[in-house]
């Protein structure tokens, strides 16, 4: 019985092997609206055709709430762009990003970026669902 339960746990974990990537960007204020336009009209169509983008959010001015026993805000400020993608596993995610370097379609999308140097700060975090 113990072996059966252990096997069930292993199978259950493997069935939930998908990962969620949460990406946060702090985009230069003067480039922000042009970046949002690019994201909506160029990045999202490209990304949605290739990966499962859960959602893509932008902050247009609502102040963040930073709390805790030692709250710190980055000297770069709070992110003003966040998006979440779901992948089967880390390998699928890494393959997507590695392919950007060789994909002519991505080259077209990136060439329309208003300012590739507008990313003050970028952060990618990886999570598994416990739901």
Label the predicted regions.
Residues 3-13:
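Sec-dependent N-terminal signal peptides
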Residues 37-41, 96-103:
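Short amphipathic alpha-helices in soluble, non-transmembrane regions
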Residues 18-38, 131:
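Surface-exposed interaction/gating patches
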Residues 32-51:
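Core segments of cupin and vicinal oxygen chelate
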Residues 49-50, 88-91, 131:
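A short, structured loop/turn motif at beta-sheet edges
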Residues 52-78, 101, 105-131:
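Glycine-rich beta-strand-turn "strand-cap" elements at beta-sheet edges
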Residues 19-26, 64-101, 125:
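Short, well-ordered beta-strand segments in beta-rich or mixed alpha/beta enzyme
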Residues 43-47, 93, 106:
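Mature, secreted membrane-active peptide modules
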């Amino acid at each position: 019985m113990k072996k059966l339960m252990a096997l069930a746990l292993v199978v259950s974990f493997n069935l939930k092997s998908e990962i969620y990537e949460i990406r946060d960007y702090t985009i230069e204020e003067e480039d922000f609206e042009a970046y949002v336009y690019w994201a909506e009209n160029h990045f999202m169509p490209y990304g949605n055709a290739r990966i499962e983008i859960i959602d893509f959010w932008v902050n247009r001015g609502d102040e963040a709430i930073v709390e805790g026993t030692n709250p710190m805000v980055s000297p770069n400020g709070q992110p003003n762009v966040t998006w979440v993608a779901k992948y089967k596993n880390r390998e699928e995610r890494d393959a997507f990003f590695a392919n950007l370097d060789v994909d002519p379609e991505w080259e077209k999308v990136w060439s329309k970026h208003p300012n590739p140097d507008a990313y003050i700060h970028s952060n990618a975090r990886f999570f598994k669902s416990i739901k």
